[in-house]
A protein has these predicted regions:
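Non-catalytic terminal/accessory segments
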Residues: 1-595
Length: 595
C-alpha cells in the first residue's frame, strides 16, 4: 500500500462500495480485536451511555452501522464520564464510549495507523507498534552520552487542550477525503454525559477513545518535526577538541619512554586513563537530543545552560503559537545532570561521575568515552512504595485480602507483582540490587500469607511447600516455596519467582498488541462467519456474542453451590474462552437463566 496519505485515503473512501467493503472487513476484525482486549482489561466490559457492551453484539448490528456510515448518518454518542483515583489522591476523569463507537473508532485507528506510522518520528515512542517506555529510555541511554543539561518537558493538560481545528487541519495535509475527516470531527465533538447532563467537547481528544492516542501523536508529530529542526540547528562541531591536560601527560609519557623510564611512563598512563582525551567543556562542540513518550519529553543538551534556556523558550513559543498548548513554566525544569537526577517514565536518569569509561563502538572496537555515560536507575521511593502492602514495622507481613485464595492463586499473584516490577526496571543499572531487596520482603510476605491461611507457621509452610530448584549460578539446589498441580498435559510446578535479576542491556524486540489482537480477532470472526450456534447447533441464523468478565468466577459460583454447571458454562470452561457465539434464542434464554 502507498503511504503518501492522499493515495491511501482515495483508495479507501473514493467510492461507497469500496468504503463499505473495507469497513465491513475491518469491523469484523475489530470486533475480535475488542473482544480480545476486553478479556485482558475488565473496564472494556463497562457499558457506555447506551448501556451496551460486546456482549450481545452481532453481525446484524455491524451491518446497521455500515449503512449509517455509508449514507453519512452515523453519529457517535456522548461518552459516559466517570472518575478514577490518581496516585496523588486526586481524581482523574475517564470517558466510557458506547460499544458501537469503540468499534468504529478501532477501524479509524487502523486507517490512521496505516497512513501515519511510516512517517512518525523515530524520537516518538508512546502508543506505537514495537515501541514502548523501554525503547524511549534506551534511546536516551544510547544517544545522550556527555549530556550537561536536560529540559524536563511538561505540557499543561496536553490531551484535554488539543485544538480541534488545528488537528483537523493537520489531518487534511495527509488525508484528502472529507467524509473521513468529518467522521473524526464527529468523534471530537461528541461530548460527554455527567450526572445525566450533556457537556460539549470544545477541545481535547475523545475521552476514553481508542483513537485518542494516535490523534495525540499526529498532533504532537508537528512538535517532533520542530525538535528535529532544533537538533540540526544547534549541532555544532564534528568532535571535541583535544583536552590540554591529556596532551601534556601524553607528551611527558612519550619522553619518559624515550629515556627508557618505563615506570614513569606507566604512571603517566595511569593519570591519562583518569581524565578525558577530549575536552568535555569545548564550547565549539554542541549536541541536542530529544525523546518523547506521549506528552512527556526530555531534551538532552551537550552545551551551556544559556543554550538550554534558549531552547526552552523556543519550545514554549512553538507550543503556544502553532499548537495552542502551554508549556508549564513551573514544572518544565532545566536540570544539571552532574548535580541532580532526572525522573522520566518511572526511571531516574543520571550521569556516570567517572572521568572515563571503556565502551564498544558500533563495529565492536573498544575505546574510551568522554565522561558522562548515561545510567538508568530504579528510584528508591518506588521500591519503598511498592513494599508498603507487604511490610509492617519494617518486617514482612501477610496480605489479609489474599488469605482466602487458593495457595496456587496466592503464589500466582505474588509472582505477577515481582515479575512485572522486574520486567519494567530491567534496563536499570541497579535492578539486581533494588529488586533483590524487594524480593526478600515480598517472598516472606507470601509465606506469611499462606501461613495465616493454614493457621500455621513460616517454618511449617516452608517444610510443606518447599521445592528444590537449581541455583541461578548452577551450583546445587535451593528450596523455594511453590506448589505442584495436575493439568491435562501432566503434572506441573509453580514456585515463587526465581528468574535471574540481571540488567538487560537493550529492550527485546517487542511485538505490538495489534499482532495478538489480529490473531484472536480472526478466530472470533471465523466463529461468527460459521453461521452455527455453538450451544444448540442451529444453522444459518443471526448470531450474537455472549461475553463474560471472568470465566473462573462463573465456574467458582456453581462449584460453591454444589450444583451442576449449565451446558453453556461447561462449554466456555472446556473451550477456555470468555466468549460464546449464540443464536438469539439461546442468548436470551442464557440471560434469563432458563438454559
Amino acid at each position: 500500500m502507498n503511504h503518501t496519505g492522499m493515495t491511501v485515503s482515495t483508495e479507501i473512501f473514493s467510492m461507497r462500495t469500496s468504503f463499505c467493503g473495507h469497513i465491513k472487513k475491518s469491523m469484523l476484525s475489530s470486533l475480535g480485536s475488542l473482544s480480545f482486549r476486553s478479556q485482558r482489561v475488565q473496564g472494556n466490559m463497562t457499558p457506555g451511555t447506551d448501556g451496551t457492551t460486546i456482549d450481545g453484539f452481532s453481525r446484524k448490528q455491524i451491518s446497521q452501522l455500515i449503512e449509517l456510515l455509508k449514507w453519512e448518518r452515523y453519529q457517535p454518542k456522548p461518552v459516559r464520564r466517570t472518575y478514577i483515583p490518581k496516585k496523588n489522591g486526586k481524581m482523574r476523569p475517564l470517558g466510557i464510549p458506547a460499544f458501537a463507537d469503540k468499534l468504529v473508532q478501532e477501524v479509524v485507528r487502523q486507517i490512521l495507523e496505516a497512513i501515519y506510522e511510516p512517517i512518525f518520528s523515530d524520537n516518538s515512542h508512546g502508543f506505537r507498534p514495537n515501541r514502548s517506555c523501554h525503547t524511549a529510555l534506551y534511546q536516551i541511554k544510547s544517544t545522550c552520552r556527555g549530556t550537561n543539561w536536560v529540559i524536563e518537558g511538561d505540557i499543561t493538560g496536553c490531551f484535554d487542550h488539543i485544538d480541534h481545528e488545528i488537528l483537523l487541519k493537520i489531518l487534511s495535509k495527509k488525508i484528502d477525503d472529507g467524509r473521513f475527516l468529518e467522521l473524526i470531527r464527529k468523534f471530537l465533538k461528541a461530548g460527554y454525559l455527567e450526572f445525566n447532563q450533556k457537556y460539549n467537547s470544545l477541545s481535547g481528544t475523545p475521552q476514553g477513545g481508542i483513537i485518542s492516542p494516535i490523534l495525540a501523536n499526529i498532533y504532537l508529530h508537528e512538535f517532533d518535526k520542530f525538535m528535529e529542526g532544533i537538533s540540526a540547528e544547534y549541532t555544532k562541531g564534528k568532535q571535541r577538541r583535544p583536552y590540554r591536560e591529556y596532551q601534556i601527560l601524553q607528551y611527558k609519557r612519550n619522553r619518559a619512554k624515550k629515556k627508557g623510564n618505563q615506570e614513569q611512563a606507566d604512571e603517566y598512563l595511569r593519570q591519562m586513563q583518569n581524565i578525558p582525551a577530549l575536552d568535555p567543556m569545548d564550547k565549539n562542540y554542541q549536541r541536542v537530543k530529544y525523546v518523547r513518550y506521549a506528552d512527556d519529553f526530555v531534551v538532552c543538551i551537550i552545551g551551556s545552560k544559556a543554550t538550554a534556556n534558549e531552547i526552552k523558550e523556543r519550545i514554549a513559543g512553538f507550543m503556544q503559537k502553532e499548537l495552542h498548548l502551554e508549556l508549564s513554566r513551573e514544572k518544565t525544569k532545566i536540570t544539571n545532570l552532574s548535580d541532580k537526577r532526572v525522573r522520566f517514565l518511572g526511571y531516574e536518569i543520571t550521569k556516570s561521575q567517572e572521568n572515563t569509561k571503556q565502551v564498544v563502538d558500533s563495529i565492536g572496537r573498544k575505546k574510551r568515552s568522554v565522561n558522562g555515560t548515561i545510567q538508568l536507575v530504579v528510584p528508591g521511593d518506588v521500591i519503598r512504595e511498592k513494599l508498603k502492602p507487604f511490610i509492617k514495622k519494617g518486617k514482612p507481613y501477610q496480605v489479609g485480602a489474599r488469605v482466602n485464595l487458593p495457595v496456587i492463586e496466592i503464589i500466582s499473584q505474588y509472582n505477577a507483582e515481582i515479575r512485572g516490577l522486574y520486567n519494567y526496571y530491567c534496563l536499570a543499572t541497579d535492578v539486581s540490587t533494588k529488586i533483590s531487596t524487594f524480593q526478600y520482603y515480598h517472598y516472606f510476605s507470601m509465606i506469611k500469607t499462606i501461613a495465616r491461611k493454614e493457621k500455621s507457621s513460616v517454618k511449617k509452610v516452608i517444610q510443606k511447600y518447599g521445592i528444590d530448584v537449581p541455583r541461578k549460578n548452577g551450583t546445587g539446589t535451593m528450596r523455594i516455596v511453590g506448589i505442584r498441580y495436575n493439568t491435562k498435559e501432566g503434572p506441573k510446578t509453580m514456585t515463587y519467582f526465581n528468574d535471574s535479576l540481571k540488567k538487560v542491556s537493550r529492550p527485546a524486540g517487542e511485538i505490538s498488541d495489534q499482532f495478538g489482537q489480529v490473531l484472536k480477532g480472526g478466530q472470533l470472526m471465523k466463529r461468527l462467519n460459521s453461521d452455527v450456534c455453538e450451544l444448540c447447533g442451529a444453522e444459518h441464523c443471526a448470531l450474537e456474542i455472549h461475553h463474560v468478565r471472568k470465566l473462573k468466577d462463573i465456574v467458582k459460583k456453581y462449584r460453591k453451590r454444589g450444583t451442576p454447571m449449565p451446558n453453556w458454562v461447561w462449554l466456555m470452561s472446556y473451550m477456555k474462552r470468555k466468549t460464546l457465539v449464540l443464536c438469539h434464542d439461546c442468548h436470551v434464554n442464557l440471560h434469563n437463566g432458563t438454559l
